[in-house]
Amino acid sequence: MSVKNSFSGVLFCLILSSWTFALAQAPSGGEPEPKAQAMPQKVVVVLAMHGEPPNDFPKDEFGRFFALHARLHYAEGADEDLHLRYAALDAKIRGWPRTAENDPFHAASQRMAEQLRETTGLEVEVGFNEFCGPTIEEAIEKAVARKAEAIIVVTPMMTPGGIHAEIQIPATVKQARERHPGLSIRYAWPFDPSEVAQFLAKRIHQESQESN
């Protein structure tokens, strides 16, 4: 089995185990979790990726984008014009045409999604947290349009404490649940640290064997 196929298989196992781990770690008094049920007839996976800017996007516009981002982040009561300018640049960056040359991360994300499709037999939509389209919110809506009976959002960002995996993606999932109250939308996170360690240990072992 190739490293690529091995990774997709291990990631699928981590997806399923992280779902169980998240239930076990859920704090009391929080959102009530539904009782365990058999897997619905149609499950669609949303692969939530970080996203990278295209390397051929105009540098001056990208500089303005980050300057606006900083002003909006640190300034209180920023005016509507700043928000509109920022949103316009964000949309332009996300909508920029992608190729394997100008955005290798985007190409790799699509390959990972294809491997997940082959490994799980499930439909997979890719969404990006920043710099690239579609957004995770848009990917969830695409899954809804596929007539999903359940949506599982998963990310390869496995380390707790990061703002994307721990704060931003859960907020997006929460908003999606509010838009679709009758649909099961689950976030398969966090990952069990022991299983992440086992995955990394396997790669370490493979690398050490290849170097001998």
Roles of regions detected by a PLM:
Residues 10-20:
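Bacterial N-terminal signal peptides
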Residues 2-10:
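Bacterial N-terminal signal peptides that target proteins for export
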Residues 24-212:
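Active-site-proximal alpha-helix that buttresses catalytic centers in soluble enzyme cores
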